[in-house]
Regions:
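Active-site-adjacent alpha-helix of alpha/beta-hydrolase-fold enzymes
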Residues: 69-83
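Conserved alpha/beta-hydrolase "acid-adjacent" motif
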Residues: 40, 65-71
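Hydrophobic, well-ordered secondary-structure elements that form the walls
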Residues: 29, 64, 75
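Short amphipathic alpha-helical segments and helix-helix/interface helices
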Residues: 45-48, 72, 104
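Short, conserved loop/helix-junction motifs that constitute active-site signature segments
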Residues: 49-53, 78-79
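Alpha/beta-hydrolase
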Residues: 1-47, 54
Length: 111
């Protein structure tokens, strides 16, 4: 669902008109966030040593309200070998044009 996109997508808005879908989606989202996304605070940064020997590319939407850019910056600082791309016209969704384009660019480097 496109609840975390910078630019609203009408197909997702129309999908939310279905009350059964909207209720199910809302329950899942609430369960996820009420449970602290099922990770303790700082979990990823505490486990960062496991990422030291693999390539890490961080793609962050500038207007992501789910995972703030400060989180991406902290991860990037903890992983000196990582790359960080801030997509200026994106929110949280990997389906946003700028994020999708950057993910494809990164993936193509590994062909």
């Amino acid at each position: 669902m496109g609840t975390s996109k910078l630019i609203p997508d009408t197909k997702y808005i129309d999908k939310a008109d279905n009350l059964d879908f909207a209720a199910a989606f809302s329950r899942i989202e609430c369960h996820y966030f009420v449970n602290g996304i099922f990770l303790e605070d700082g979990f990823i940064l505490k486990q960062v040593d496991k990422l030291m020997n693999i390539p890490v590319h961080i793609v962050q939407g500038r207007y992501d309200v789910v995972c703030p850019a400060t989180s991406a910056w902290e991860l990037h600082k903890a992983l000196p070998h990582s790359t960080l791309e801030i997509i200026p016209d994106a929110g949280h969704s990997m389906g946003e044009v700028g994020i999708a384009k950057e993910l494809v660019n990164i993936t193509n480097k590994y062909k």
